[in-house]
């Protein structure tokens, strides 16, 4: 199994609290309101949002405080991290979850407006950058980033997906400011623009690329993992809230650890829960959050993630979205260390193993894992009507993708999947005996 579950340790009840959180009134027996901003459809934040909420873990942890207060949790659902930051810097939201680039803007705005925030934990991450993907229309002639010159590309400026677009274009020798027409759009608007033909490509974060590919409305043009730079989502808290209500924040982080453990132990059920809450297809949720999904969930603030965050600052500065950001001052793992105890060190040391090919049979509570993509294809070929979804890892980046949406290459007896055509072409160029095959041909060869 791909995940490294976070062990939950028994912790003593914390001392009574004396100050109020968010909009709560102070005083013994008062009702304390804790406001949590989350992004239900940004499914790599589910352990601090959608899944956490559906499990009721935070409320249970608050009830266990027994500090004389009654707690009320207000959940606020947003499409992106920007409005969460706006609410936090206005003192109206206590805890929020968002991607790495929005987290930096959160840090910058908080300091600028005198409402400093702190990054306290991580939700979903991918050490190579596979959470972001550039897609184009299914019938598009585009097969590489070079073809984007002079074209319209939709993204959300200031998002991790925009960061991926900027870096990818620069590596391809294109100027992201001069060589493309960038459309600054919300994910749903950009998806509609791609389908309508008013955008030639879309660079977005999870779950939009996978959703559009699953629906047959897009095909991958660029796999963010080609950058080989970590991307992640995390939890941020207002500094004044954390200082006044440390036990409440630690209760949230304990609840996040519970949700993480549940996702790791019950990946299919967790995907179904998130699908029910968001309206996303469970097959898409599982692509990202499954047992061998694109994302890994460990709450610890790993050094390589913090290092990547520091590298992200220059991209936002170039876009004039922030000035310098003191990442070391923004990162604060004290609350997570106290909340998780010894399990924090386990989370910090966890290394995601390579992804594996998987088949999700209809009506099954578990998926089947296969040693090679060819073995998966042989199974699918023999059980076509019984397979709900099939997943394969990119042969070069390890990014999981839908088997029927992958670009396939036959190299001798091996059948190799790729997320994007450019990586497949690179492989073909380096292996003269290899040849491109369709999904149907790959199934036939495997069987």
Positions of PLM-derived features:
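Bacterial N-terminal signal peptides
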Residues: 8-18
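Intrinsically disordered, low-complexity linkers and terminal regions
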Residues: 9, 342-369, 373-447
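Bacterial lipoprotein signal-peptidase II cleavage site
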Residues: 17-30
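Short, glycine-/small- and polar/acidic-enriched structural segments
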Residues: 28-175, 181-185, 200, 229
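Secondary-structure end/capping motifs
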Residues: 43, 244-323
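A bilobed periplasmic-binding-protein/Venus flytrap-type ligand-binding module shared by bacterial periplasmic
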Residues: 131-141, 231-247, 409-411
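Pocket-lining segment of extracytoplasmic ligand-binding domains
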Residues: 182, 188-276, 374, 383-390, ...
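Conserved C-terminal helix/tail region of periplasmic/extracytoplasmic solute-binding proteins
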Residues: 316-353
